[in-house]
């Protein structure tokens, strides 16, 4: 399997990307190199190798829940550059 410049142009169109002709050629070459590498991986003998689902044997390892005293409102706000009553005051971000 190989990728053509027509394939790259089609994928770029779907992704709403614009490439120059040089970029399109480079993308075509790079994608073909990747596919060639994947084809090489298909040649590897994996007979007797168990499929790997994760890279380690630990599943859902979570930290222990430790109860602690939360910050008071004053402690939380003491380094705030701006505040209003007991709330952080931030600049408007939606016009």
From Swiss-Prot:
Which biological process, per GO, is one annotated for this protein?
Answer: glutaminyl-tRNAGln biosynthesis via transamidation
Q: What Enzyme Commission number(s) appear in the record?
A: 6.3.5.-
**What is catalyzed by this enzyme?**
L-glutamyl-tRNA(Gln) + L-glutamine + ATP + H2O = L-glutaminyl-tRNA(Gln) + L-glutamate + ADP + phosphate + H(+); L-aspartyl-tRNA(Asn) + L-glutamine + ATP + H2O = L-asparaginyl-tRNA(Asn) + L-glutamate + ADP + phosphate + 2 H(+)
Q: Which Pfam families match?
A: GatC
InterPro entries referenced in this protein's UniProt entry, alphabetically: Asp/Glu-ADT_sf_sub_c, GatC
Tell me which UniProt keywords the record has, alphabetically: ATP-binding, Ligase, Nucleotide-binding, Protein biosynthesis
| Keyword Ligase carried by entry | yes
One MF annotation (Gene Ontology) recorded for this entry: ATP binding
**Record's keyword annotation contains Cytoplasm:** no
How is the subunit organization of this protein annotated in UniProt? Answer: Heterotrimer of A, B and C subunits.
**Role, per record:** Allows the formation of correctly charged Asn-tRNA(Asn) or Gln-tRNA(Gln) through the transamidation of misacylated Asp-tRNA(Asn) or Glu-tRNA(Gln) in organisms which lack either or both of asparaginyl-tRNA or glutaminyl-tRNA synthetases. The reaction takes place in the presence of glutamine and ATP through an activated phospho-Asp-tRNA(Asn) or phospho-Glu-tRNA(Gln).
State the similarity comment. Answer: Belongs to the GatC family.
Q: What is this protein called?
A: Aspartyl/glutamyl-tRNA(Asn/Gln) amidotransferase subunit C
